[in-house]
Each structure stands twice: as C-alpha cells, then as structure tokens.
Amino acid sequence: MASIQNLYETVVGVLGDQAGKVISALGEITVECLPEHYISVMTALHDHEDLHFELLVDLCGVDYSTYKNEAWQGKRFAVVSQLLSVKNNQRIRVRVWVSDDDFPVVESVADIYNSADWYEREAFDLYGIMFNNHPDLRRILTDYGFVGHPFRKDFPISGYVEMRYDEEQKRVIYQPVTIEPREITPRIVREENYGGQ
C-alpha cells in the first residue's frame, strides 16, 4: 500500500493543477482531468522520469447517461485510459470527461501512444466520441453505412436495420428490423429431479 501512496503523491506533484482530481481508492489511482488538460496530462504521465507510463493497455468510451440504475447528473461521456509503467511496475487510470453530450469530442493521444489508434477508432464507432487529430478515424467494427453507435445506452437493443441476402437482387440489402416479440417461458428444473435421480 505504501507504493500506491508514493505513486499518488508523485502524480499529484507532477500534474499539479492539470489533474482536476486524483483519486486513490481500492488500491488504484485514478486521474480525472478536463479535456483541455488531457494531452498535457497524458504526455506528463508518459514522459516524466518519475512516472514513465510508457504503455497504454486500454482506452474505451463510457456512457454514464444511466449509472447505478438512476439518471446521471454529470457529463454523459468519458474516455477512460489504462496505463502501465513496466519500469516501475505500476498502473494508473485516466478519465477525461467529454464536454459536449450531443457531439462528444476529445483530443487524440495516438501521437503519444501508438496503441491508442485502434482503441480510439473503437470508441468512435461504438460510442460516437470524436477524436481530434486522429490519423484515421473511421469505423472499425460496424459497417460503413451503419446508423448510430451501438454501445450508447439510448441505442435500441434490436438496432434500426437488419441485413440479409436477397436472392432476386443477388446482393445484400438492408431493411427495417422485423423482430416479432414472443413470450418465453423458462424451463424450471426441480432439485429432486435434477440429474435424473
């Protein structure tokens, strides 16, 4: 636990006011910063000799519109990065809140961490978060003609359109979703008959 406290103090000392909030909880350090400080925070964490978080392990978008089964009062979208210092054997999380809920935009960290390239494309594709100065921001998991962003909490579970092969046209076509609701009755297995006994 002493190393977590040392890391906490080092991060607070290095980042200063750029880190909006530094949280130490459950044996982990989380840095929450504003979008205008995001690049400088990530650069400091990467380059500073006392920190040296040279590896971006993960970057993802988060939609907080409903959080813990209730309406969320803060910003809707955040980008969360998990960083690793191989040299110091330490991990840190960075959360940046995106300013605009209607058109979420944050700066790209692909110039600092090469691995951010595809992670940012995934966050763009699934959450609609735009990354300024990204070298190749385009969809990575859904079709190019896909409408919407499927990991947003307001996206319908069934989607908007479905794709199928049309024998007459000899090509793949899109059509509105045609899912018929049905009642599903669960099969109940009684303990006394379980396993054929």
From Swiss-Prot:
Quaternary context: NDH-1 is composed of 14 different subunits. Subunits NuoB, C, D, E, F, and G constitute the peripheral sector of the complex.
Protein source organism: Neisseria gonorrhoeae (strain ATCC 700825 / FA 1090)
GO molecular function: NADH dehydrogenase (ubiquinone) activity; NADH:ubiquinone reductase (non-electrogenic) activity; quinone binding
Enzyme class: translocase
Any single Gene Ontology cellular-component annotation: plasma membrane
Keywords: Cell inner membrane, Cell membrane, Membrane, NAD, Quinone, Translocase, Transport, Ubiquinone
Catalysis: reaction(s): a quinone + NADH + 5 H(+)(in) = a quinol + NAD(+) + 4 H(+)(out)
Main localisation: membrane
Cross-referenced PROSITE patterns: COMPLEX1_30K
Lineage: Bacteria, Pseudomonadati, Pseudomonadota, Betaproteobacteria, Neisseriales
Localization, UniProt: Cell inner membrane
Gene from which this protein is expressed: nuoC
Family matches, as InterPro entries: NADH_DH_suC, NADH_quin_OxRdtase_su_C/D-like, NADH_UbQ_OxRdtase_30kDa_su, NADH_UbQ_OxRdtase_CS
EC number: 7.1.1.-
Biological function: NDH-1 shuttles electrons from NADH, via FMN and iron-sulfur (Fe-S) centers, to quinones in the respiratory chain. The immediate electron acceptor for the enzyme in this species is believed to be ubiquinone. Couples the redox reaction to proton translocation (for every two electrons transferred, four hydrogen ions are translocated across the cytoplasmic membrane), and thus conserves the redox energy in a proton gradient.
Protein name in UniProt: NADH-quinone oxidoreductase subunit C
SUPFAM superfamilies from the UniProt entry: Nqo5-like
Record's keyword annotation contains NAD: yes
Sequence similarity: Belongs to the complex I 30 kDa subunit family.
Membrane topology: Peripheral membrane protein
Cited Gene3D superfamilies: NADH:ubiquinone oxidoreductase, 30kDa subunit
Keyword Disulfide bond included in the entry's annotation: no
